[in-house]
UniProtKB/Swiss-Prot annotation:
NCBIfam families: PRK00823.1-2 (NF002017), PRK00823.1-3 (NF002018). SUPFAM superfamilies: PCD-like (SSF55248). This is Putative pterin-4-alpha-carbinolamine dehydratase. It catalyses: (4aS,6R)-4a-hydroxy-L-erythro-5,6,7,8-tetrahydrobiopterin = (6R)-L-erythro-6,7-dihydrobiopterin + H2O. It comes from the Bacteria.
Length: 100
């Protein structure tokens, strides 16, 4: 599960997570990724899904054509933990491969 991050730790994490912001009153991180087309968006989701499954930590996300909206929160902990920060970083790395 993991321990909830403090307000200070959440703010510090966001500095290292370009494109992400707090949502749900500080209980989640969110980002919308916009790709060139559906194939890239789906490719991103496929790669991110493999990482999520490997780490047994899954995003709440939604895909419409070339956009992917992601919300990260550790539901068992009731907010943001280091697991969410790690997955957000990995998602940014994957998106960078697509020029995002």
């Amino acid at each position: 599960m993991g321990d909830l991050l403090s307000d200070e730790a959440r703010r510090a994490a966001l500095v290292e997570l370009p494109g992400w912001r707090e949502a749900d009153g500080g209980k989640a991180f969110t980002r919308t990724f916009t790709f060139r087309n559906f194939n890239e968006a789906f490719g991103f989701m496929t790669r991110a899904a493999l990482v999520a499954e490997k780490n047994d930590h899954h995003p709440d996300w939604r895909n419409v054509y070339k956009t992917v909206e992601v919300n990260l929160s550790t539901h068992d902990a009731g907010g943001i933990t280091a697991r969410d920060v790690a997955l957000a970083k990995k998602m940014n790395e994957i998106a960078a491969r697509f020029g995002i």
